[in-house]
């Protein structure tokens, strides 16, 4: 119970310290802390449109966070979520633009294709790790760049005739919901949030309730003991990266089938995959934690857009707040050390 409480307190303390640091930066820079954070709040909850946009931003964050968290829980570091997301995005749009058909066939097929593409892209570093002991961090980082340039080539040379972006996907493959758009003052909120929450339930079930999840966690904790117990270390490493990549591919589908409904040539990474690392760390690599952390980061990202408009505070202040929060979460040992000292002092 005490350990679980500690896991909850560390992120909360990190959030408070991050917000305090943001307030200090605003004060030093000559801005009003009250108006700055008021603008941030209004940018999230001030209008129903902003609420819709916040939930829309949360959706890919949940899935990219799950991708990172799943790998972390099984002893692997998937830094290639950004690349897997781009591959999934392109694959989903390819299916979405290739043909028209019944929505109950077309949309699931596009989602499955995105998950399969992301999973395959994650499987490559998985098999290199399992068979040739190549460290997954190096491979996944390099594969991000391969994915960026490969998907750009496919968009401009395969999906289009030397165009910078594809046409709009068919309505039968779209995650857009007229009902959700209408009730949120025509924001870009779409049905992807349901997919993301279902994915969180699936991760929770696999990790905590299935035999395969126990094997994956055991291999991540101690490969030698797992092999001695009869588990296939190689198979579990590849399976873990496959599932992690599938979550990332779905994150790309949320953008391709929901937010934008097309794929475009990109000059740089989207950042959603890298933000997934922050989401996973802040969420303690648990399914519920990832959902909550995605809500926080998604809210901060959308709310920050309103800060320069309403209060004149640069939106970059929120980037600093997020960075400090992650810094404190990553250095959670220091927070636990201080908490332990305070507890001992209180006992005396």
UniProtKB/Swiss-Prot annotation:
Protein's recorded name: Guanosine ABC transporter permease protein NupP
Top-level lineage group: Bacteria
Main location: membrane
Family: Belongs to the binding-protein-dependent transport system permease family.
Protein keywords: Cell membrane, Membrane, Transmembrane, Transmembrane helix, Transport
Function: Part of an ABC transporter complex involved in the uptake of guanosine. Responsible for the translocation of the substrate across the membrane. May be a nucleoside transporter of broad specificity but with various affinities for different substrates.
Membrane topology: Multi-pass membrane protein
Species: Bacillus subtilis (strain 168)
Residues that span the membrane, as ranges: 8-28, 61-81, 85-105, 107-127, 136-156, 189-209, 237-257, 277-297, 320-340
A GO-annotated cellular component: plasma membrane
Subunit structure as annotated in this protein's UniProt entry: The complex is composed of two ATP-binding proteins (NupO), two transmembrane proteins (NupP and NupQ) and a solute-binding protein (NupN).
Gene Ontology MF term list: transmembrane transporter activity
Subcellular location, record wording: Cell membrane
């Amino acid at each position: 119970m005490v350990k679980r409480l500690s896991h909850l307190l560390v992120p909360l303390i990190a959030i408070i310290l991050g917000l305090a640091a943001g307030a200090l930066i605003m004060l030093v820079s000559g801005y009003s802390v009250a108006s700055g954070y008021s603008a941030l709040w209004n940018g999230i909850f001030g209008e129903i449109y902003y609420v819709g946009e916040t939930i829309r931003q949360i959706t890919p964050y949940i899935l990219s966070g799950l991708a990172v968290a799943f790998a972390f829980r099984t002893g692997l570091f998937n830094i290639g979520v950004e690349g897997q997301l781009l591959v999934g995005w392109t694959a989903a749009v390819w299916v979405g633009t290739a043909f028209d058909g019944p929505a109950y066939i077309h949309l699931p097929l596009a989602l499955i294709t995105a998950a399969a593409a992301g999973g395959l892209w994650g499987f490559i570093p998985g098999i290199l790790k399992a068979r040739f002991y190549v460290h997954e961090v190096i491979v996944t980082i390099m594969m991000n760049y391969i994915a960026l340039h490969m998907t750009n080539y496919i968009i401009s040379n395969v999906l289009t005739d030397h165009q910078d972006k594809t046409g709009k996907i068919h309505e039968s493959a779209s995650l857009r919901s007229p009902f959700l758009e209408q009730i949120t003052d025509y924001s870009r909120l779409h049905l992807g949030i349901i997919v993301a929450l279902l994915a969180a339930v699936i991760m929770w079930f696999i990790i905590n309730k299935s035999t395969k999840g126990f094997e994956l966690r055991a291999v991540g904790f101690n490969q030698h003991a797992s092999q001695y117990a009869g588990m296939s270390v190689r198979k579990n490493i590849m399976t873990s990266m496959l599932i992690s990549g599938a979550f990332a591919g779905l994150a790309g589908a949320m953008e391709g089938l929901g937010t934008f409904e097309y794929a475009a040539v990109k000059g740089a990474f989207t950042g959603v995959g890298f933000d997934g690392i922050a989401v996973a760390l802040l969420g303690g690599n648990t399914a519920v934690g990832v959902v909550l952390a995605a809500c926080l980061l998604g809210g901060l990202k959308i709310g920050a857009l309103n800060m320069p408009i309403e209060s004149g505070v640069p939106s970059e202040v929120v980037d600093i707040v997020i960075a400090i929060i992650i810094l404190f979460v990553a250095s959670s040992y220091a927070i636990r050390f201080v908490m332990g000292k305070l507890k001992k002092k209180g006992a005396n």
